[in-house]
Amino acid sequence: MAENQYYGTGRRKNSAARVFIKPGNGKIVINQRSLEQYFGRETARMVVRQPLELVDMVEKLDLYITVKGGGISGQAGAIRHGITRALMEYDESLRSELRKAGFVTRDARQVERKKVGLRKARRRPQFSKR
């Protein structure tokens, strides 16, 4: 591959994304498909583009991404985290700007496990007094 390529790993919920960045003209490829083909929802596309728009690099970099696991929002969040890490590897001076926007911190929230005797993680069975 390219010699001037930068890499970042992103994770969110049950998703993990590997992001490769190289100078180009703004092409985003996710699992061999375009951004528009991969994410049907506009909100997911916006989440993916956020770090690039913040640092004005939308038209300057090509992104090659592989993502596994989780659902749509988890994958979009993992990609955003991966892009952020790759951008910091590309140019360390972008870190403070990305940190201010909250993209550097890994969102550690996970689905809470279902407990025995409950219907869901916290939802109790209906209580009948009589």
Swiss-Prot record:
Superkingdom classification of source: Bacteria
Biological process terms in GO annotation: translation
Family classification: Belongs to the universal ribosomal protein uS9 family.
Annotated protein name in UniProt: Small ribosomal subunit protein uS9
GO cellular component terms given for this protein: cytosolic small ribosomal subunit
Top-level taxonomy: Bacteria, Pseudomonadati, Pseudomonadota, Gammaproteobacteria, Enterobacterales
GO molecular function, one term: RNA binding
Database matches in InterPro entries: Ribosomal_Su5_D2-typ_SF (IPR020568), Ribosomal_uS9 (IPR000754), Ribosomal_uS9_bac/plastid (IPR023035), Ribosomal_uS9_CS (IPR020574), Ribsml_uS5_D2-typ_fold_subgr (IPR014721)
Metal-binding found in the keyword field: no
